[in-house]
């Protein structure tokens, strides 16, 4: 399954690339679906890259659902990369094993960039039984991530969706709903 999302951002390609690629380990600062993220060394280092990979805790539990993300390709000059995302500790019903993300930024004018996210999902066999639902849900999810990156780059602060997710997680940690 493949999902392609494009979004225009009112910022230079250098600024967008800096947040996405150079600050790769800190995705939890702007992505609402990631309560915590941290760098993880892998065997692949690329010239110009400040991170080899990251771990994203997806439910706020260090022993819970995670995504490990490793660069497969990285081009500092052209501002493109490919990231292998593997999901860990997921319930059996989860239809996706992981994703391959191709990320690209193009300069489209003064202080404007266009970001293209191409997600190719690695599906479990039962996902094909509900393929339209999985594709629809993943499309919404990727759309939200692109919106959150745009907001963070342009506004210099997390998207309201991230703030709401963080507040909800804090309430849950304190035993409130």
Task: Locate the predicted segments by residue.
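Residues that form or flank phosphate/diphosphate-binding pockets in enzymes
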Residues: 11, 66, 125
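Glycine-rich portal/gate segments that line the openings of hydrophobic small-molecule binding cavities
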Residues: 28, 38-94, 151-155, 160, ...
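Short amphipathic alpha-helical segments
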Residues: 12-15, 19, 137, 141, ...
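Hydrophobic/aromatic beta-strand elements that line small-molecule binding cavities or substrate pockets
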Residues: 5-7, 67-73, 98-107
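Juxtamembrane/interface motifs at transmembrane-helix termini
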Residues: 35-40, 48, 102-103, 134-137
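Hydrophobic ligand-binding cavity/cleft-lining segments
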Residues: 1-46, 176-177
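Beta-strand/loop substructures that line and gate deep hydrophobic ligand-binding cavities in soluble
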Residues: 85-144, 151, 161
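Short strand-connecting beta-turns/loops that link adjacent beta-strands
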Residues: 12, 63, 76-78, 108-112
């Amino acid at each position: 399954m493949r999902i392609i999302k494009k979004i225009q951002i009112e910022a230079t390609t250098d600024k967008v690339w800096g947040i996405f690629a150079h600050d790769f380990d800190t995705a939890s600062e702007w992505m609402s679906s990631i309560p915590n993220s941290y760098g993880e060394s892998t065997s692949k280092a690329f010239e110009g890259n400040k991170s080899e990979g990251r771990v994203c805790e997806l439910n706020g539990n260090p022993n819970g659902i995670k995504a490990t993300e490793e660069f497969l390709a990285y081009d500092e000059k052209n501002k493109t990369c490919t990231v292998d995302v593997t999901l860990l500790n997921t319930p059996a019903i989860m239809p996706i094993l992981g994703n391959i993300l191709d990320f690209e930024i193009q300069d489209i004018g003064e202080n404007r960039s266009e970001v293209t996210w191409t997600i190719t999902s690695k599906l479990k066999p039962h996902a094909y039984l509900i393929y339209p639902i999985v594709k629809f849900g993943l499309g919404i999810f990727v759309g939200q991530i692109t919106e959150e990156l745009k907001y963070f780059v342009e506004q210099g602060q997390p998207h309201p969706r991230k703030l709401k997710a963080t507040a909800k997680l804090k309430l849950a940690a304190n035993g409130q709903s």
